[in-house]
Design a protein with these regions (language model features):
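Solvent-exposed loop/turn segments at secondary-structure junctions
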Residues: 1-2, 40-44, 69-71, 121-125, ...
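Terminal peptide-recognition signature
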Residues: 54, 118, 142, 195, ...
Length: 221
């Protein structure tokens, strides 16, 4: 997205025409099985953000590697250092499915209807400005569940039972309307997908996240 973090459209899912061009140039078509590889404990869950966005664009056969890049290396799978050269292809996206997307406008309008979950680090939640946010803090009343709490010490997802208990112990129920956010909608996309996997169906990733909210909304510390 053009501009900088915190701008009105920065961090949002691209419009269908833009996304068609982006994915088409990479040869990522809907008839392929797509495997996404990222980092878990050492990253922000970029693979989940891509999965979340591809699903919204109508891609159905998309998977992530549990444990990420480290798990693949530890398994002994063959890797290479040379960059791949994708072959461009035609991609058609009729519309974006916004059923698991939260917008700034909706959150401002109906804030009290949602339970808000901040998945950033302790430092960020408590007010540290680490990534050029307009101000520090967290959304008013936000429940704090760290993104890294989704994983065991080796970087693999915890069991559904462990995760569900963690969410419920934090004050969430499967009937709640839940909004996840982080700095730029990446870690929160991972958390939204995991919550959905655990049966929390009414979950929404706030893709603009704190970068935008710090510009337009109130925060607590």
């Amino acid at each position: 997205t053009e501009g900088k973090q915190g701008d009105e459209k920065w961090g949002c899912i691209q419009e269908p025409e833009q996304l068609e061009e982006t994915l088409g140039n990479l040869g990522i078509t809907k008839d392929k099985e797509i495997i996404l590889i990222g980092e878990t404990l050492d990253g922000w869950g970029d693979d989940a953000r891509l999965l979340w966005e591809l699903r919204a664009a109508g891609y159905e056969d998309v998977k992530m590697v549990d444990g990420g890049w480290k798990a693949l290396k530890d398994s002994g799978i063959k890797t290479q250092f040379l960059a791949s050269k994708p072959e461009p292809a035609e991609v058609k996206i009729d519309e974006i499915d916004y059923s698991h997307v939260m917008t700034t406008e909706e959150l401002q309008k109906n804030y009290d209807e949602y339970k808000i979950v901040d998945v950033r680090t302790d430092e960020e939640y408590e007010g540290a400005i680490l990534y050029d946010e307009a101000k520090g803090g967290h959304l008013p009343g936000a429940i704090h569940i760290r993104y890294t709490d989704l994983f065991d010490d080796a970087g693999y997802l915890k069991s559904n039972e462990e995760l569900t208990k963690m969410f419920e112990d934090a004050g969430l129920s499967k009937d709640d309307e839940i909004v996840t956010y982080c700095t730029g909608g990446i870690r929160s996309a991972y958390t939204q997908l995991v919550m959905e996997m655990c049966g929390f169906e009414h979950t929404y990733n706030y893709d603009q996240s704190f970068w935008r909210w710090a510009v337009v909304g109130d925060v607590e510390k």
